[in-house]
Regions:
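Internal glycine-rich alpha/beta core junctions
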Residues: 1-180
């Protein structure tokens, strides 16, 4: 499994029936009942909730990394001449691309996506803590909020921090995803 940009995360591929140890001499897998009959999926989702928040946090950090890399690049990359009342002056030194309006727009969009995602992830993490350590009323309120926010905490950063990194690639001149 070679996911670009996702180094250091715990993920794996599961194959059922292709293993070294067949069941009763045939391809297959041994299954175990999780929870009560008909309730296993609910148990699995309960178990996976914190992992789903973790996936959203990983996407958030990738978006943050892309933003900070493109911000640093934009602060240092010269391109174009300053525009004055009489147009561009070729005799003047080049300006950094952070001074270009469209580059600035892309940087601000990246920052808003990444910081918005971070705020959501930190809020969900606080709710997880509240659910485990708060009094009964606070824990129940946190549980209810997490039921709604957990899928969002995974999907929203995954979608919008990818968009932030698409903008980061544009700020870098469209080089794409490269390794030095």
């Amino acid at each position: 499994n070679h996911k670009l940009g996702w180094r250091g995360t715990t993920n794996t591929l599961l194959n059922f029936g292709e293993g070294k140890y067949p069941v009763d001499g045939k391809a297959g897998a041994i299954g175990y009942l999780v929870g009560s009959p008909g309730k296993g999926l609910a148990c699995m989702f309960h178990m996976m909730n914190e992992a789903r928040i973790g996936v959203g946090t990983a996407a958030t950090m990738l978006g943050m990394a892309g933003y900070h890399a493109s911000l640093e690049y934009a602060k240092n990359r010269p391109q174009g001449r300053p525009v004055g009342p009489e147009g561009k002056d070729a005799a003047k030194p080049q300006v950094r691309i952070i001074e270009h309006a469209d580059v600035r727009r892309m940087l601000l969009a990246q920052k808003s996506y990444a910081e918005g995602a971070l705020a959501l992830e930190l809020y969900c993490a606080r709710l997880v803590d509240e659910q485990k350590t708060g009094d009964e009323k606070a824990a129940d309120e946190a549980r209810i909020l997490l039921e709604v926010l957990t899928p969002i905490a995974k999907s929203w950063p995954s979608e919008w921090c990818l968009e932030a990194n698409s903008l980061a690639i544009q700020v870098h001149g469209g080089y794409g995803y490269t390794r030095d």
